Amino acid sequence: MDVYLDSTVVLRQMLGSGNSWDGWGKWEKAYASMLLRTECNQAVNRLHAEGKIDDVRRARLGSWIETVCSCVTMVPVTESILRRAGEPLPTDTGVLRSIHLATMLELQAAHGVNCAVATDDDKLLRAAECLGFENALNVTSVTPEVMPEAPAEENPEGKSKGKKA
């Protein structure tokens, strides 16, 4: 199964908030918008600014974000994606969600890639399902792939451990 990763799922894996997704890393290929790096870094920067994480944890999470981005096919935000994001969608999504949806539609139309969407964002999921995309969080038959596990807070070296999911 190919998946399109949204930052909400990456952040959940990285921060250990909520239940971790059992399908993490168990995909044939993963795609994400170039927005993923920015969205994840901004979320971590916000936690740091609010004093919820220290400098060491911020650096460790930043490294993990880069590792995830290097393991995923990052799709550039092109003019055609931005144009498509401005077109009507089946539900009210807002700008960033529209860009994510347009990215999935571009992957499908221009490259023949049919992704299931991995997101914790209900509005994004609802719109994606209206467009015919499957919810990756509900899919169980997947092929294992090596993806990094989230950095443990107690890991003093700050190294991410690779995990064969």
Which residues does each PLM region occupy?
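C-terminal binding/interaction regions
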Residues: V113-C115, D122-R126, L131-A165
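Helix-adjacent hinge/juxtasegments
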Residues: G51-V77
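Short glycine/serine- and small hydrophobic-enriched flexible loop segments
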Residues: Q42-A49, L105-E106
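Active-site neighborhoods of divalent-metal-dependent phosphate/nucleic-acid chemistry enzymes
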Residues: V72-K123
